[in-house]
């Protein structure tokens, strides 16, 4: 009986520590994009509900590839949805003709290169990978 309790405590401790392993996610825009976005605005941009920045310019969201740890973290923290909920959301939007999901890129380096070259792009990367080619507007 004591062995079961010890194993359960160890399991709970490991599960609790696993959430600490996630890194911060930085939402990034082009250096020449002076926009600010609220948490709600960020969510709406990545869900295809907000198509323009406050300055009237088109907002072009860019995702990391499906299943990446940073993308999962972003979806949970910024969009308040699991990856399966996001997948179902976009399947429904595409099927009904109401939108298409953001473009997907493979790496943080790819995201930052695109954002650095496109004033309308908004993406997210692991905060530890941010360089001076982009501007961080929010960290989750």
Question: Which role does the model predict for each range below?
Answer:
Residues 1-9:
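Bacterial N-terminal signal peptides that target proteins for export
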Residues 11-16:
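Repetitive helical segments and hydrophobic/amphipathic motifs
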């Amino acid at each position: 009986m004591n062995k079961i309790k010890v194993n359960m405590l160890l399991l709970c401790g490991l599960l609790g520590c696993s959430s600490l392993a996630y890194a911060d996610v930085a939402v990034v825009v082009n250096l020449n994009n002076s926009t600010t976005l609220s948490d709600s605005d960020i969510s709406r941009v990545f869900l295809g509900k907000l198509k323009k920045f406050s300055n009237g310019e088109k907002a072009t969201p860019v995702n990391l590839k499906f299943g990446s740890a940073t993308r999962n973290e972003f979806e949970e923290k910024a969009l308040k949805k699991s990856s399966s909920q996001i997948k179902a959301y976009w399947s429904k939007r595409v099927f009904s003709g109401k939108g298409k999901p953001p473009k997907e890129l493979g790496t943080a380096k790819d995201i930052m290169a695109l954002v650095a070259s496109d004033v309308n792009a908004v993406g997210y990367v692991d905060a530890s990978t941010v360089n001076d080619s982009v501007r961080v507007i929010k960290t989750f």
